[in-house]
Amino acid sequence: EFNSSTLYRYATVAVHELYKQLQGETAEAVQGFVRAFICSMPTGKQNTFANRTLPDAVLVTLRKDQPINLAGAFERPVRAGKNNDEGYAAASAKAFANYVGEVYNDWLGKPELSLVTGRFFAEIPDAQTYPLKDLLNTLTKELHNRLGNGRDGQ
């Protein structure tokens, strides 16, 4: 029997602390971390299960208040759509997007910036959707601007 589960991964980077150490290289370091985090997978059974699957959706946010772990979106098991008209990936993304909206409305509000890659996160409030390369470039540019070391169009 083979099981393909929803895998929710979460990481946080204290950019303000990283900036104290790296100064002008902070944005590039964050970009490298985000790229590696998105494109890497746990290595257990990597040959048995060919786990080089890329994510179906990615959400990157910049917040000034506190990081938010959104794992609560999967407190209940996600089921494929009625009559199997949508798969687990779409149903998981829908549950996640709904939960994100609830958390933003009920608790801390929207982040300063939300960047999305993947076809499933269109419902996330105020998220800008990009292919991965453009998401990383936009993130880097935003960090340069917010850290006060903007680099004319880079």
Predicted regions and their residues:
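Basic polyanion-binding and macromolecular-assembly surfaces
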Residues: 1-154
